[in-house]
Amino acid sequence: MRSEKSLTLAAPGEVRGPEGEQQDAGEFQEAEGGGGCCSSERLVINISGLRFETQLRTLSLFPDTLLGDPGRRVRFFDPLRNEYFFDRNRPSFDAILYYYQSGGRLRRPVNVPLDIFMEEIRFYQLGEEALAAFREDEGCLPEGGEDEKPLPSQPFQRQVWLLFEYPESSGPARGIAIVSVLVILISIVIFCLETLPQFRADGRGGSNEGSGTRLSPASRSHEEEDEDEDSYAFPGSIPSGGLGTGGTSSLSTLGGSFFTDPFFLVETLCIVWFTFELLVRFSACPSKAAFFRNIMNIIDLVAIFPYFITLGTELVQRHEQQSVSGGSGQNGQQAMSLAILRVIRLVRVFRIFKLSRHSKGLQILGKTLQASMRELGLLIFFLFIGVILFSSAVYFAEADDVDSLFPSIPDAFWWAVVTMTTVGYGDMYPMTVGGKIVGSLCAIAGVLTIALPVPVIVSNFNYFYHRETEQEEQGQYTHVTCGQPTPDLKATDNGLGKPDFAEASRERRPSYLPTPHRAYAEKRMLTEV
């Protein structure tokens, strides 16, 4: 049986080998790190009173770290107790030690906050590569968090950028954010209210003459009124019957009503604010290219350009109506212009996404959908297969019924979609026994298909939600860096006096101390007990 070697300890800073000979710190480091027999020796690591025991060869897997390099960890060696002492977070060291045992797997314990565990990674010097991989696994922001966000170099531009881009930066920035949210809400309310029949009739200036149907002052046809559901979709349009006396006399009235309409005036004020906000943010942004790559800025552009297109089209239309007499070709061109304009102005509804700039919940939802694109793609693919399968099955099951509501397989696509999604619209339904069996299987398959990827999406949402919560807490509290011996040292139980113990402690004082965060002075401090 191999005799177990041991280390005989002498005075502080002095180590004796297996035969009792005296060794200095350098010889002890070489004996500890090199050689096949010594690499299997075990050592004790004391983390704030909790003792861990491991082998030297386990720590030597990562020689560039604090524990893997004998020259670095010897500064924490306590010759009085024959152990390495670290006044650090105890739950975190389980994961740190597992990093060595597993060959590079770094997993944060669930009961350790993110910022505290990252401090432990830096203290034990696991390296920037391990820290970057850990941050990527945790889905963290780039190193430095809020301090690393690009800011303009000019002081005035920086202040303007913070005012309009970061509502949490100051009180005036929060005030601007509140104004922006109110303007967005007013714009959305106006977009909805202007489609009400009573407002459209009042805005047009009256009703029809003798038929009981609301028409514009120019006596437009009922078909044109249906097409013009917007408040300012060509209020000066020429009626289908040509430009008569009544139409000519009311042309100027129509043009005036467009620009004096209350909905148009409120919409104009909202657009003025949106345009001002966009131009100010663009002029103060640190990178013009990155500005247009931001999806929120693209939404801002999409939210305002329909107004200018509508306004320009209205001015051109008024000019053409005043210079060209009516006709069928002119009316057809107007009808096409109306259809195009309605599609363009429908984009105004995307203005509601501007709220996501000021809503953490919408941002979390967007990140969840972005992270769940693979699962959503699988869901759509499964639904596509089910729609093809069950629409074909119900068509052939109902083919012998003369009253069948499924004239073809493509017509049955709609039924398959609403059945698999458990909506059950009711406009199409099977009437034969075989068709009802197919419908039952379709509903069951739809429930299973939709239920499979939902837990993954919910898990992604919980992940982003808890990450956002931790980042908010990190902005309020910061863990106090510990590990340095206190200057007020007291006498110990082994008989050493206060001066002797202080001298021995200075010899073991670590040269590596974590650099305090730049923003620590500006935050409330939370000391770990």
Swiss-Prot record:
Q: Which CDD domains match?
A: BTB_POZ_KCNA6
Intramembrane residues, please?
410-421, 422-429
Q: Where is this region: Disordered?
A: 1-35, 203-238, 488-513
Q: Where is this motif: PDZ-binding?
A: 527-529
Chief localization: membrane
Protein name according to UniProt: Potassium voltage-gated channel subfamily A member 6
**Covalent lipid sites (S-palmitoyl cysteine):** C285
Q: Which UniProt keywords apply?
A: Cell membrane, Ion channel, Ion transport, Lipoprotein, Membrane, Palmitate, Phosphoprotein, Potassium, Potassium channel, Potassium transport, Transmembrane, Transmembrane helix, Transport, Voltage-gated channel
Q: What residue intervals traverse the membrane?
A: 172-193, 263-284, 296-316, 338-358, 374-395, 437-465
What is the species listed in this Swiss-Prot or TrEMBL entry? Mus musculus
Q: Which domain of life is it from?
A: Eukaryota
Sites of the modification Phosphoserine?
S3, S511
